[in-house]
Amino acid sequence: SLDVTIEKEIIDLLMEIKSTEKMSIIFITHNLRIVKQISDYVCVMQNGKIIEQGSTQEIFESPKSNYTKKLLNSSPKGFKKNNSERISQILNVENLKVWFPIKRGFLRRTKGFIKAVDQISFDLMEEETLGIVGESGSGKTSLALAILKLINSEGSITFQNQNLQNLKNRNLLTFRKNAQIIFQDPYGSLSPKMNIEAIVGEGLDVHEKISKSKRKEMILQILNEVGLDEDMITRYPHEFSGGQRQRIAIARALILKPKLLILDEPTSALDVSVQSQVINLLKTIQNKYSLSYIFISHDIALIKSVSDKIIIMKDGIIVESGETKNLFSKPKKNYTKELIVSSNLK
């Protein structure tokens, strides 16, 4: 769960200690990229048993077990890129600022500001995926919450040609229906006191006036679309795996038929094979519903695989941005180059 540059520093430190102290290391992880990078010998486990073992080269180049092959093929293949000219702009952000005051003293006077987001500008087209990558504290989540009007901000946010900063009450409610967010933690984002029918149907209770039978029909339909069984609606979040919980979160957002989905680290808490399943699901529903995505992550390899355009953030500002292919083939900023090198990407 470390940022990519910190991850590299920790790995380098471990390898240095191993060499100088002549130590052996048992490294436990679900990150196959790191396993391939540092391991001499690999054991693959499933359900408490070692199902395959061998040298790193043998495991990665000639796997024998079907489960090992599945793991190695689980790297996200990315969303379908629409290279044709997109129809229109769905979101425009200009000079967005999210500053949190620093108050000190007996009178709690403002002594300065934490500039979580500072003068950010970008646009997003229909059916496009914009990747936002940066380390912890770079301002990614604050930017997402500001776009959704969940925290105060300054600057211009235009969604479907409507300035969100001027919206109130009913008009703001309409926007919230059209722009949904899927959070990082599938364990903390679902209420443990609500069953799946209540969780997925909560948005309908706010935004739609429909009969109970129609409500249940819509819930069952959306559960089916995200790969969950109908008989799950009476169960509670603690009865599900992390991947299933994230599918429930996707269903909750998707049932309102939004135009924009903000995905805030949606796979970082999941195992590699489950990550791939969730990414493939997101790809499928984007194509089916013509959705626009803002995909937030500190995993630059994942961002590369899913994004049409990328924004690199650091300390609340945009360090570099551009089309995915151009940004990776010809990065201009040292920070971008550092992220790419740390992820072993070319």
Model-assigned labels for residue ranges:
Residues E58-P63, F106-K111, L164-Q180, V206, ...:
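ABC ATPase NBD coupling module
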Residues G155-L164:
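Conserved ABC transporter NBD signature motif
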Residues I50-G54, S62, S321-G322:
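ABC ATPase "signature
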Residues S213-D231, I340-V341:
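Conserved ABC ATPase "signature" region
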Residues I255-K259:
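A short, proline-enriched helix->beta-strand linker immediately N-terminal to the Walker B motif
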